Amino acid sequence: MQEILNIAAYKFVAIDDSPVLREDLRERAQALGLMGTILLAPEGINLFLAGLPDAVRSFVAGLRADVRFADLETKESWSAAQPFRRMLVKLKREIIRMDHPAIQPAAGRAPGVDAPTLKRWLDQGHDDEGREIALLDTRNDFEVDEGSFDGAIDWRITKFTEFPPALKAHRADFAGKTVVSFCTGGIRCEKAAILMREEGIENVLQLEGGILKYFEEVGGAHYHGDCFVFDGRRALAPDLSARAADASARAAEDVGLSSGLKK
């Protein structure tokens, strides 16, 4: 029986009270018996939490009571057991490290494409303007190895800070194409899409909600394998079930993705 509700969410929004907010969120999460990781930075919030459904939803409702997070969108999945080992709330320079301070998603984001539209484009082999689709995987190499979109571009980066120089080396590859950046839940592809537009690449979109939202809305069409996740479930299938529910992969201790977690 799938009793544990897992949520992933992020929002780029200015936060100037991180130390106080950290204690508040930690106390509330612990009181509700939740486990997982919350990252706070001046640029926003990034969280992965799991617990009993009522407890998770109570926490999210409390978070949305803060005007900064009123429109926070969550992605849900279920598991038979708690995939995290403890509850962590961390303060970071960035909620997803890129080491590119000029990229400020809270000040404006690149346009997005939703899952049904992307599936339709992939079905027909081009976007609505007739341009070829270039799917760009912005995740780390070991995540890509678990599964990705068919024909997606994979630069074999080992951490997200390698994305900017990789982009400079390959920017000419995107001429005349519609580029769709994607990642697990949307956070990395949001920064990646902004950087590509600032580098002068035209027709750049980000996959809204990432792979997990795509799975939720259209399943595994044009996708092979599973989606790596940074918790004890290891990976999620296109039906959002855990492929390795009993795997011994460690629970996420730093979803900043800079720890070099290996399979």
From Swiss-Prot:
A matching Pfam family: Rhodanese
Parts of the chain that traverse the membrane: none
Active site: 183
GO molecular function, one term: oxidoreductase activity, acting on paired donors, with incorporation or reduction of molecular oxygen
GO terms, biological process: tRNA modification
Gene3D superfamilies recorded: 3.30.70.100, Rhodanese-like domain
UniProt-listed Enzyme Commission number(s): 1.14.-.-
Keywords: Oxidoreductase, tRNA processing
HAMAP family (UniProt xref): TrhO
Family: Belongs to the TrhO family.
Function: Catalyzes oxygen-dependent 5-hydroxyuridine (ho5U) modification at position 34 in tRNAs.
The protein's name: tRNA uridine(34) hydroxylase
